[in-house]
Regions:
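Local sequence-structure signature of Cys/Sec-based thiol-disulfide redox active-site neighborhoods
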Residues: 48-81
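Surface-exposed charge patches
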Residues: 69, 73, 172, 207
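Function-dense linear segments that define catalytic or interfacial modules
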Residues: 1-50, 120-155, 169-173
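Non-catalytic, surface beta->alpha helical segment in thiol-disulfide oxidoreductase systems
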Residues: 103-119
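Conserved beta-strand scaffold positions in the cores of enzyme catalytic domains, especially
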Residues: 35, 78-80, 108
Length: 241
């Protein structure tokens, strides 16, 4: 309840069976929600480059094979130089293989992890933002035209106009980006995705409220006082974007 946006309505005593919604209910209104699921792999954007790369390798090097497989998968052209001794990398101030060098820009890329981070696929946040805006408008419309089996559910929906946006395929995204599930970069990507979703939904909700007015129980809620969901966690959150 400390993190509820319905603190002005009453105490929430339970969730639904799947626990994906936490809303207020009483004998006069039964909480329901209008949900949509976003398939995150649809928003993977492949990285393209026309730069010419040089991949320094040596015989019987598994990481050398892996970096070449990665570049092939990304459709990035390169030429391979198989070195006989590590001293051949001295001009580049590097002592391990594989080593990738960007000839076009005349700069070093680095080893396998550096190459993956530089040329891996990314999340198209602009497309995700646009999708969430559309979903928010659609879910808002569903509230008005939906079939309600009992009047208590309709009363709840009309008073609070709740919507929920979830995701699927986050693990698939990490696989496509070749990122460890528990790595710091995976955690940041996760935060960035939901930051985009939250912002886009709030932005569209504001646009709708400008035309239709706020929902009935808006005034007195945390959001009506400028307290967003991340403000209710008792922690400092700083966006890096």
């Amino acid at each position: 309840n400390k993190k509820s946006n319905q603190q002005n309505v009453g105490i929430i005593k339970s969730s639904n069976l799947c626990t994906e919604i936490i809303e207020y209910s009483d004998d006069k209104e039964y909480a329901v929600c209008n949900l949509a699921s976003i398939a995150l792999p649809k928003f993977i954007k492949q990285t393209h480059t026309s730069d010419q790369l040089v991949v320094y390798t040596k015989n019987n090097c598994s990481w050398c094979v892996m970096v070449k497989l990665f570049l092939d998968k990304q459709n990035i052209s390169y030429r391979e130089i198989e070195i006989q001794h590590i001293s051949q990398l001295a001009p580049h101030n590097h002592k391990t293989v594989p080593f990738v060098y960007n000839e076009t820009q005349n700069i070093p890329v680095g080893g396998y992890e550096d190459t993956v981070q530089t040329y891996c696929n990314t999340i198209d946040h602009d497309a995700l933002f646009e999708c969430v805006c559309i979903l928010t408008m659609n879910l808002n419309k569903i509230i008005d035209i939906n079939h309600y089996p009992v009047p208590e559910t309709k009363r709840s929906n009309m008073r609070h106009r709740p919507i929920g946006l979830g995701v699927q395929g986050l693990a698939d995204v990490f696989m496509a980006l070749q990122i460890s599930f528990t790595s710091p970069i995976a955690r940041q990507i996760n935060k960035d995705i939901f930051e985009t979703i939250y912002y886009a939904s709030l932005y569209t909700s504001h646009q709708l409220a400008t035309v239709d007015g706020p929902y009935e129980t808006f005034f007195g809620s945390p959001i009506s006082k400028g307290r967003f969901q991340f403000d209710l966690w008792g922690k400092d959150f700083k966006s890096t974007r």
